[in-house]
């Protein structure tokens, strides 16, 4: 990501400000300079806020970014343009604020644009989705951006001095290692779940084992005393338990079967005695009831006499009823004959009227026949009347169109002949164009090589001059440095170290007196006077310091010039002078012009020929289409003429409308005549059928009357014969007998009931006498007592057997469940062993006491430290190297950083470094971190870095080394910007972004020193 343009409105001290980063040439190192509080860091805040909606430091909130001097009606906004992977983007973020006069907050806005074909096209227009788009585009979030692109105050050395837990948070964010922690948690939960399942299965086994019935049997109790944790012993005891349970069940079953047999014997004996007792009682009762039934015998005999008489008179009564029915039928037949004769007379009258109507209709038959003939002949015309009518309408139009098409066809043919004459024998020559293009390309390449070589030679001469000038300066500075070192060597430094010696000597003098033994040398003190000229020594010390400062300045200048020579040498090595043509630029340009003219002429000729061919093809196509249209016109015109001729010949009409009206009228007349004729025929047929039906009915009624008269005569004869047989003289005798018929059913039922009961008593008494014959009745009370005793014993043993059988089966089921649980538990422990081991390893229970996440983070930290040491070795003159502290505890250590001092060959805590050494280490570590993150992430493009930290803690030599490091970053294609108050940087860095403040707002400008 490389900044291009930054626009700030009401942001911090900037009310309306624009910064054009495109003024920075070739990723030049530049300094951001200004007074304290002028808003230098706010530039970093603006870029971070534009991208992520956050400041460059976590401590600064969004509300702190709005200018206190902003117009209450204007929003705070930042517009940031940047380049990423050769594509240009623009983001515009407006912060939320309460507009002056309002009580509700105006919402934030965020738009993301991408430049396409020189214009910006919007990609996102919502705050949340837009910010997510930027995170995915850059490949980093706000925290990662602070670590990789912008190193703000307070953040620069945080990674270096942080403890393991703090580094874990930073590295977790940068390398997205939370997924490894998630794996650990998943495995932890999986193990926890598996352990719970295993424990639950142990509990189920123990519960089942405790529930096994012992039957109060000592052997079973002994087997059940085994603890369920002894799984193998439990498996061994289960068959023994089952065998002993079967033995107990068999013993109880044998007792039960004996009791059942005893019960069945007494039950049978009791049942037989009860049956005998019931049979004797029933026999006595039936005999008494039978005697009472026989007393009804006289009444039954009287009933049978009445029923016999009723049976004998039945035929006579039937004949009397039949006579009444026959007389009714005769009367009905006479009535039907009279009504049928009247219907026949009415039908004959209706037929005469319809015959008259038919004769009137037949008088118009000839006229209707002529109309039917016309309809049959012209029906085909009427069915397609639209076709013929359209022919009358189209014939004139088709004549006109045909003449017009013929004229247009002749014109097109003439045009085609002219185009063919223009083309002649000419053909397009594209091979010649290819040859000319190749020749032009080759000439342009030769011209470009000559121009590039001239430019490269000029650049080489300039660089060689700069190099020579730098070498001369280095020679002069080296000579001056040698003179200063010679001058410095002339001083005896061993006698000039006066740090605290003067006060130390004064303290010794105050503690001793003349004659005492010296605590330093052990000799007797002879004199306490002054023997050292401290003023002279101090003067020489100042001279030495001045020389050492000059030496340091010379070394710094030499280092800077050596770095510049190195940079110039790199540029010289990158200059490539290619082999060029023997021809001069003038000759090549002349040949280029000739080929370009020939190319243009050939292109014009090809273009003209192609246009003529295209016009020829177009005319040919038009002629073909016109000919098709003309042929179609002639065909349609011929068809219209044939249809009109056909219509007029068949119909004898020359007007479609008149024909259509007459045809419809004829059809209507014919249909009406036909319909009327059909109606008359239908009526005649119906009348004939109805008359025939009535005639048949009349014959039927007459025959029926004759039959009824004969039946009546025969029935009278039968009545006379029956009365004679029954000795009945008149109807009174008959009526008396008829009165008994109402009681006949009751009398028959009474008789039948008597006979049925009489027979049943005979049968039942005979049966009971056979059952009780030769049998003795026993004492019922004694039998009952014995029965109850045997039954109680049997039920008790059955219940006991059922309980024992159920408990045995239950024991079998439980032991089977126990075996199943144990088998599943063993398999589960075997299957999950690898998961348990893996969970322990990733949780830190391993030989390194590291969690999986910390193991990964240590791997990345080792890579970062290795990359950082490449630069730290240069900056510290091969004295310091960063090392990772190897001592670890359970999962949370191993990320601390110590420094290894190659001078003392020992490692020490990072806090023992001086301010300048800490800055060097922090810078090297930050650059190493950014490079490793870029290597791992792939999609992150680190084209710029901004630093706001610590240059004031560096001495001159260290400052020069740090600048060399940053210059090397620039040579890798990265824009480097730094914030500092160090005056030497203003002299060393030619490009400065100056931030000025006038108390209430700030402004910026680029300037060169």
UniProtKB/Swiss-Prot annotation:
Provide the binding site for ATP. 34-41
Q: Does the keyword Lipid metabolism apply?
A: no
State one molecular function term (GO). exonuclease activity
InterPro entries xref list: P-loop_NTPase, Rad50/SbcC_AAA, SbcCD_Nuclease_C
Keyword vocabulary terms for this entry: ATP-binding, Coiled coil, DNA recombination, DNA replication, Endonuclease, Exonuclease, Hydrolase, Nuclease, Nucleotide-binding
Query: One Pfam family for this entry, by name?
Result: SbcC_Walker_B
Q: Which residues form a coiled coil?
A: 176-208, 264-366, 392-501, 535-638, 664-802
Asked whether the keyword DNA damage is assigned, the reply is no
Write out the GO biological process terms.
DNA recombination; DNA replication; double-strand break repair
Q: So which domain of life are we looking at?
A: Bacteria
> Its quaternary structure?
Heterodimer of SbcC and SbcD.
Q: What does this protein do?
A: SbcCD cleaves DNA hairpin structures. These structures can inhibit DNA replication and are intermediates in certain DNA recombination reactions. The complex acts as a 3'->5' double strand exonuclease that can open hairpins. It also has a 5' single-strand endonuclease activity.
Q: Which PANTHER family does the record associate with it? A: ABC TRANSPORTER ABCH.3 (PTHR32114:SF2)
What protein am I looking at?
Nuclease SbcCD subunit C
